[in-house]
Design a protein with these regions (language model features):
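Class II aminoacyl-tRNA synthetase catalytic cores and aaRS-like
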Residues: 1-588
């Protein structure tokens, strides 16, 4: 194909306006579409700023003959004069002008693409990911990546203004026993030894605080080899930060300023600050989860006490600290739910471990219920009165282990709100969730593990329970939640070696494990450690909010699938036997 020669682009395809009429311009880009009207050919030329209509007349035979052979996605260089269009297109910013071509160079041809290069293309996701370089030509995805670049700059500017230093930390580190599985990298030089790719820069950023760097940040790739859900990726980006000589409120206040700046600059929205605080315990009681969506009601009600003496054993058997009977009431929306729809909701909550879904309906004073014959009138009325807010009611009840009840009702309230179109996607309800439990019980391992990570500072008044009553210990930890998604989380860190060792002991890590995995880290605590804390945002989730998408793949240039594969490159792939031998690995 031809080169550009001496021609160099003077404008982008989305820039030209009426004020540019009569200018000679040079544009370069891809052919969006072409229309041959016989004596006149129109070409829509596209780059990442937009589209300009190119007009080629038959009075210039050389250019006209070239233009007749042009197809979609050919790469062109066009030199011509800007003129006002006779038939204007108000759907695009350049719709008042066109360029009359005087010179046309085909820089490259193109095969027929396997997907349409337009935002409303409905190609299967697998095809889009295989040809991601074509998918990324779509204006929507390009705009998302531009906004991501702008967001990165805003974050850097804000943190720089607040005394932070951008410092890189190593990608090749030590495997750790806590959290998700590590991605391991075999060492060729050190036989039978492995590096781990970082799940976060946690230890290194704390060491930077011990080093006296005071304020650190990094926009960094992290890696977790875990089972993937819809909006999880095996490699993801964190906005990671750490601050010395701070407590919880200092970290939260600084980050409220960052959130306010990002949403104002990117979305044009004023986020009220200070952002409301809610304890973990309150969030679980009211919403059944630690990342509540506050844009709608349907709060959980605990009715365990009302039915603890009921003859209905499904309810009365749940009267202990690990079980409960709870419900949500959707009020006057009850008329939207037929028995058939309720049956579908029951099937839905069973996906969360529930054995069934009880319900009570009140319509114009008449009571219907799936459990009417099992409850006394007094019990039925007490449930209705304790939950009723509207004239009518539809109460959904779960009775089971607390985690099943919370998970089931939380998912149910979210589903109903979305099914009923009660969620305003242009509203952003932020909340800080604080006072998390320091530990959670892992039934698989039959022991307590750190809910966040093992370097989190316990609340001072709870340290006494660290080794004796782990369920009582609350953490100086905080998550920032928006519209039902956790977009960031952090904590104040332990800054005392004795307390850190006690934390490891509470996690049942042996002295050998502590020394092997964290010896270097605990050793650093012997040389003066400042109070410090930090926070990390999931950059991909943050971008989903900022651009308004519910698909994480819309904000990542080259995402993986839910099975952690890259359909574009074919990764992961088999490795040559010679390469395996060099790193001392033998496959079964």
């Amino acid at each position: 194909m031809n080169s550009m020669g001496n021609l160099r682009r003077t404008h982008m395809c989305g820039e030209l306006r009426l004020s540019d009429v009569n200018k000679e311009v040079i544009l370069m880009g891809w052919v969006q579409k072409e229309r041959n009207l016989g004596s006149l050919i129109f070409i829509d030329l596209r780059d990442n700023t937009g589209i300009t209509q190119i007009a080629i007349k038959d009075d210039n035979k050389e250019i006209f003959d070239k233009a007749k052979d042009v197809k979609s996605e050919y790469v062109l260089c066009v030199k011509g004069d800007v003129r006002e269009r006779e038939s204007k297109n108000n759907n695009i910013p350049t719709g008042e002008i066109e360029v009359i071509a005087k010179e046309l160079i085909v820089l490259d041809t193109a095969n027929v693409p396997p997907i349409y290069i337009k935002d409303d293309d409905n190609a299967q996701e697998a095809v889009r990911l295989k040809y991601r370089y074509l998918d990324l030509r779509k204006p929507k995805l390009q705009n998302n990546l531009k906004l991501r670049a702008k967001t990165n700059k805003l974050i850097r500017d804000y943190l720089d203004e607040n005394g932070f230093y951008e410092i890189e930390t190593p990608f090749l580190g030590k495997p750790t026993p806590e959290g998700a599985r590590d991605y391991l990298v075999a060492s060729r030089v050190n036989e039978h030894s492995f590096y781990a790719l970082p799940q976060s820069p946690q230890l290194m950023k704390q060491l930077l605080m011990i080093s006296g760097m005071d304020r650190y940040y990094q926009i960094v790739k992290c890696f977790r080899d875990e089972d993937l859900r819809a909006n999880r990726q095996p490699e993801f980006t964190q906005v990671d930060m750490e601050m010395s000589f701070v407590d919880q409120e200092d970290v939260m206040t600084l980050n409220e300023g960052l959130i306010k700046k990002l949403f104002k600059e990117i979305r044009g929205i004023d986020i009220p600050t200070p952002i409301k605080r809610m304890t973990y315990a309150e969030a679980m009681e009211r919403y059944g989860c630690d990342k509540p969506d506050l844009r709608f009601g349907f709060e959980l009600k605990n009715i365990t006490e009302l039915v603890k003496d009921s003859e209905f054993k499904v309810f009365s058997s749940c009267n202990d600290k690990n079980k409960s009977v709870r419900c949500i009431n959707i009020g006057n929306y009850e008329s939207e739910y037929s028995r058939k729809k309720i049956d579908k909701l029951e099937k839905f909550v069973k996906e969360y471990g529930a054995k069934g879904l009880s319900w009570i309906r009140v319509h114009d004073g008449e009571i219907q219920s799936s459990i009417k014959k099992f409850l006394s009138d007094e019990e039925m009325n007490s449930i209705i009165e304790s939950t009723k807010e509207d004239e009518n009611a539809l109460i959904f009840i779960l009775a089971d282990k607390n985690d099943i009840v919370f998970n089931g009702l939380s998912a149910l309230r979210n589903k109903i709100a979305r099914d009923m179109n009660l969620v305003d996607n242009d509203t952003f309800e932020f909340v800080w969730i604080v006072d998390f439990p320091l530990f959670e019980f892992d039934e698989e391992e039959n022991r307590f593990v750190a809910m966040h990570h093992p370097f989190t500072m316990p609340k001072e008044e709870d340290i006494q329970y660290l080794l004796t009553d782990k369920e009582k210990v609350r953490a100086k930890a905080y998550d920032i939640v928006c519209n039902g998604d956790e977009i960031g989380g952090g904590s104040i860190r332990i800054n005392n070696s004795d307390l850190q060792k006690k934390m490891f002991e509470a996690l049942e890590l042996t002295e050998e494990m502590i020394e092997n995995k964290f010896g270097f880290f605990v050793e650093a605590f012997n040389y003066g450690t400042p109070p410090h804390g930090g926070l990390a945002y999931g950059m991909d989730r943050l971008m989903m909010l900022l651009v308004g998408t519910d698909n994480i793949k819309d904000v990542i240039a080259f995402p993986k699938t839910q099975s952690a594969t890259d359909l574009l490159t074919g990764a992961p792939s088999n490795v040559d036997e010679k390469q395996l031998k060099e790193i001392h690995i033998k496959l079964d």
